[in-house]
């Protein structure tokens, strides 16, 4: 009786082992954002396949083998136009991968003999890494020796990214080195890597501390802050001085206008020549002269000017030539 139970247990164990062997271990799949990924089924006897059901959180697609081509029914809208089945092998291809496509996928392969083989896949989606950026900071110490910190980073925060440095082989995104003027220039290369891509960049360090005062990037903000504070004080001061200058200039212009309005200008022509006022008086002869000519007698007489003419004479005293009054007889 005990021997019979042992045989039954052995048969059950063998059956369970065969069933477990048909279900492959979960496979890890790495996909690249925007590209495609292929889920390999490795079906040994395609002709025995009745149908294949793909699921990921919910139903994805249903494949029914046909005479010439498999019939594919996409049951989830987000995969429409992006799923393809490779004929005769029934491998599933997803194109134009998105970040939300990551997750667990399960394929239930149903054979004609009503046996089901299940395969499970874990899909991860990654971006291709761009060239990393290396930043350098240093602190000077005695004897022109400085401690240099090199930091390597990628453009965006990415998962599963590892960093390494050459020639030292440091496995970190930060590299600490000590450099002195006696050291030769060295080139340090940072390599960033994720499961689907890798990228690298290099920097050369050549006498960074020679005749260089102590420097640390954290204190680099201080001069910039002082410059901003200086500008905040200088700009309002310049604006105030300009406004004061403009107000004073306007006041001077107004005073000049008032003075010009009160000033009377007279125009004197230099070419004007004064005219002489002369009064002529002619004395007729009472008698006919004889044949013997008598000497001509000339009489000069002074004429008194009237009050009106005196006033005119007083106004014209400034002229270069005084007016004369002469009577010729």
Curated annotation (Swiss-Prot):
Chain ranges for the short sequence motif ITSM 2 as given in the UniProt record: 298-303
InterPro entries per the UniProt record, alphabetical: CD2/SLAM_rcpt, Ig-like_dom, Ig-like_dom_sf, Ig-like_fold, Ig_sub, Ig_V-set
UniProt topological domain (Extracellular) ranges: 22-221
Residue intervals of the Ig-like C2-type domain: 132-206
Membrane topology, as annotated: Single-pass type I membrane protein
GO biological process terms, semicolon-separated: adaptive immune response; autophagy; cell adhesion; innate immune response; negative regulation of interleukin-10 production; negative regulation of interleukin-6 production; positive regulation of MAPK cascade; positive regulation of monocyte chemotactic protein-1 production
Post-translational modification comment from the UniProt entry: Phosphorylated by tyrosine-protein kinase LCK on tyrosine residues following ligation induced by agonist monoclonal antibody. The association with SH2D1A/SAP is dependent of tyrosine phosphorylation of its cytoplasmic domain. Phosphorylated on Tyr-280 and Tyr-300 following platelet aggregation. Phosphorylated on tyrosine residues upon high affinity immunoglobulin epsilon receptor aggregation in mast cells. N-glycosylated.
Disulfide bonds: 152-190
Record-listed Phosphotyrosine modification sites: 265, 280, 300
Entry-linked SMART domains: IG
UniProt subcellular location: Cell membrane
Motif, ITSM 1: chain positions: 263-268
GO cellular component, one term: plasma membrane
This protein's UniProt keywords: Adaptive immunity, Autophagy, Cell adhesion, Cell membrane, Disulfide bond, Glycoprotein, Immunity, Immunoglobulin domain, Innate immunity, Membrane, Phosphoprotein, Receptor, Repeat, Signal, Transmembrane, Transmembrane helix
Domain of life: Eukaryota
Expression across tissues: Predominantly expressed in hematopoietic tissues such as lymph node, spleen, thymus, and bone marrow. Detected also in lung.
Function: Self-ligand receptor of the signaling lymphocytic activation molecule (SLAM) family. SLAM receptors triggered by homo- or heterotypic cell-cell interactions are modulating the activation and differentiation of a wide variety of immune cells and thus are involved in the regulation and interconnection of both innate and adaptive immune response. Activities are controlled by presence or absence of small cytoplasmic adapter proteins, SH2D1A/SAP and/or SH2D1B/EAT-2. Can mediate natural killer (NK) cell cytotoxicity dependent on SH2D1A and SH2D1B.
PANTHER family the record matches: SIGNALING LYMPHOCYTIC ACTIVATION MOLECULE, SLAM FAMILY MEMBER 5
Domain notes for this protein: The ITSMs (immunoreceptor tyrosine-based switch motifs) with the consensus sequence T-X-Y-X-X-[VI] present in SLAM family receptors have overlapping specificity for activating and inhibitory SH2 domain-containingbinding partners. Especially they mediate the interaction with the SH2 domain of SH2D1A and SH2D1B. A 'two-out-of-three-pronged' mechanism is proposed involving threonine (position -2), phosphorylated tyrosine (position 0) and valine/isoleucine (position +3).
Assembly behavior: Homodimer; via its extracellular domain. Forms a head to tail dimer with a CD48 molecule from another cell. Interacts with SH2 domain-containing proteins SH2D1A/SAP and SH2D1B/EAT-2. Interacts with tyrosine-protein phosphatases PTPN6/SHP-1 and PTPN11/SHP-2 via its phosphorylated cytoplasmic domain, and this interaction is blocked by SH2D1A.
Name the record gives this protein: SLAM family member 5
Organism: Mus musculus (Mouse)
């Amino acid at each position: 009786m005990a021997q019979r139970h042992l045989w039954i247990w052995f048969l059950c164990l063998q059956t369970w082992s065969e069933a477990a062997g048909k279900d492959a271990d979960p496979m890890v799949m790495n996909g690249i954002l925007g590209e495609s990924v292929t889920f390999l089924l490795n079906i040994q006897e395609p002709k025995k396949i009745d149908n294949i059901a793909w699921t990921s959180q919910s139903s994805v697609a249903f494949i029914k083998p046909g005479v010439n081509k498999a019939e594919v029914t996409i049951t989830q809208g987000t995969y429409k136009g992006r799923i393809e089945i490779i004929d005769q092998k029934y491998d599933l291809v997803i194109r134009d991968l998105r970040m939300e496509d990551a997750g667990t996928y399960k394929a239930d392969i149903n054979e004609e003999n009503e046996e089901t083989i299940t395969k499970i896949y874990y899909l991860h989606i990654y971006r291709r890494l761009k060239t990393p950026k290396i930043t350098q900071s240093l602190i000077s110490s005695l004897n022109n020796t400085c401690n240099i910190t090199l930091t390597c980073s990628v453009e965006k925060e990415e998962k599963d990214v590892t960093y390494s440095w050459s020639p030292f082989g440091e496995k970190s995104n930060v590299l600490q080195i000590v450099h002195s003027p006696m050291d030769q220039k060295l080139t340090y290369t940072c390599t960033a890597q994720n499961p689907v891509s890798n990228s690298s960049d290099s920097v050369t360090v050549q006498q960074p501390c020679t005749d260089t005062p102590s420097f640390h990037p954290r204190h680099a903000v201080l001069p910039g802050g002082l410059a901003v504070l200086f500008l905040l004080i200088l700009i309002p001061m310049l604006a105030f001085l300009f406004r004061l200058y403009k107000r004073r200039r306007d006041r001077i212009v107004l005073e000049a206008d008032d003075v010009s309005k009160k000033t009377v200008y007279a125009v004197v022509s230099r070419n004007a020549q004064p005219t002489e006022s002369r009064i002529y008086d002619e004395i007729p002869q009472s008698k006919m002269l004889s044949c013997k000519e008598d000497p001509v007698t000339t009489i000069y007489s002074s004429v008194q000017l009237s009050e009106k003419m005196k006033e005119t004479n007083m106004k014209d005293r400034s002229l270069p030539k005084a007016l004369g009054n002469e009577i010729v007889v």
